[in-house]
Amino acid sequence: ANLDDPHSLHRLKGLAGTVIHLAPPPSDGTIDRRTRHLAAILPRHGTVVYVSTTGVYGDCGGASFDETRPVAPANARAVRRVDAERVLRRWARRAQARLAILRVPGIYAGDRLPLERLKQGTPALRPEDDVYTNHIHADDLAAIVARAIFHGAPQRVYHTVDDSDMMMGEYFDAVA
């Protein structure tokens, strides 16, 4: 099946009561056509876990915040993620279904580290340009997805971050 081709999805309709939606939005436009195509085949009374991004909040200026902060996407990709969240919320209401939205920061794992950037000597951030950042290990994210499937409260947004309060420069130092 191909989320860019809605006809290819019809054969999947009704096959799964639980769906984990990890696909990124398309690279252009202001709507997430892929999520719209997926929502059209999702089952009534189903469960969906959508892996979104903390990027939907835009630039928070280093402030700490929780899931109640209004979204303020600052780039087209984040706008498409907000669109996907709204599409899935509408589906969940209409289908009397369970939806967990996981807002995820940078994902890291052994094969997902900025090693090439470090090997190439790409300059890191100057202290005056540094920003706070959060990350999550891929294994921790997988465990949270499983927990959201079985124990997540319906129609909830969850921040899935490591809560490290680390500057981006410190992150690069730790990786190095």
Task: Please provide the spans of the model-predicted regions.
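Short-chain dehydrogenase/reductase
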Residues: 63-86, 131-135, 165
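Substrate-positioning beta->alpha
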Residues: 107-117, 126-149
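Conserved Rossmann-fold NAD(P)-dependent oxidoreductase catalytic core, especially the SDR/UDP-sugar
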Residues: 37-76
